[in-house]
Amino acid sequence: MDTIHYMLDNAGYLASLTFQHLWLVALAVGLAIIIGVPLGVLIVRHKWLATPVLGAATLLLTIPSIALFGLMIPLFSLIGHGIGVLPAVTAVFLYSLLPIVRNTHTALDSLPPGLREAGRGIGMTFWQRLRWVEIPMALPVIFGGIRTAVVMNIGVMAIAAVIGAGGLGLLLLNGISGSDIRMLIAGALMICLLAIVLDWLLHRLQVVLTPKGIR
């Protein structure tokens, strides 16, 4: 009951931290989509790149999150931004790359060869085939990678509070430092709820964007 009262009494503060958390995750995953999807296309077209690119992305994901955030501090201190949003978003961006690149590569590489041959047969260029045939067919799997990145990094971004990025992780950090169990439970509940809601919303968006013929 104490936790519920705390959450009701601090609803405005919790909402502010939630939107801040959402913005940080959206920025990191958005950058990963911009970089990761074209990178996935590239390693499908140039297959010799697949092993080193996917290997590097996998290696990044094996680094403990607190260690990766710690590594960002001296790197970004060189440009005067050792703590705050920039190193946090960069770390989460790196974590987001693997599921997006891997799913893009898997989705495009597993398409039936006949689709590409049919596109070539009617005179489509590579980019036309990619835009009108391959990406629409691969979209459900690509979106699966985006969903994985978002849900995974809702939790990872909470740790970014230790380097001054803000977000819902502040509740956990302040709860630990102040031995306030209400803040700890409230922070954990908000992070879990946010991950569940975003996963559901992205699933609905995936259904809407998937061509009717392959739903």
Curated annotation (Swiss-Prot):
UniProt-annotated location(s)? Cell inner membrane
Q: Which CDD domains match?
A: TM_PBP2
- Check the record and name the Gene3D superfamilies matching this protein: MetI-like
Keywords recorded for this protein, A-Z: Cell inner membrane, Cell membrane, Membrane, Transmembrane, Transmembrane helix, Transport
Q: Which interval of the chain is the signal sequence? A: none
Q: What happens when the gene is disrupted?
A: Deletion of the osmU operon eliminates the residual osmoprotection by glycine betaine in a mutant that is lacking the ProP and the ProU systems. OsmU deletion has no effect on the utilization of glycine betaine as an osmoprotectant when ProP or ProU are functional.
* Domain ABC transmembrane type-1 as annotated: residue spans: 18-202
Q: What is one process in the GO biological process aspect for this record? A: glycine betaine transport
Membrane-crossing residue ranges in chain numbering = 24-44, 51-73, 78-100, 132-152, 153-173, 183-203
What triggers expression?
Answer: Induced by osmotic stress. Part of the osmU operon, which consists of four genes (osmV, osmW, osmX and osmY).
Q: How does it sit in the membrane?
A: Multi-pass membrane protein
What coarse category fits the chief subcellular location reported for this protein?
A: membrane
Is the keyword rRNA-binding in the record? no
Per UniProt, subunit arrangement is: The complex is composed of two ATP-binding proteins (OsmV), two transmembrane proteins (OsmW and OsmY) and a solute-binding protein (OsmX).
This molecule's function is given as:
Part of the OsmU ABC transporter complex, which is involved in the uptake of osmoprotectants such as choline-O-sulfate and glycine betaine. Probably responsible for the translocation of the substrate across the membrane.
Family listed: Belongs to the binding-protein-dependent transport system permease family.
* Protein name as annotated: Osmoprotectant import permease protein OsmW
Gene name of the record = osmW
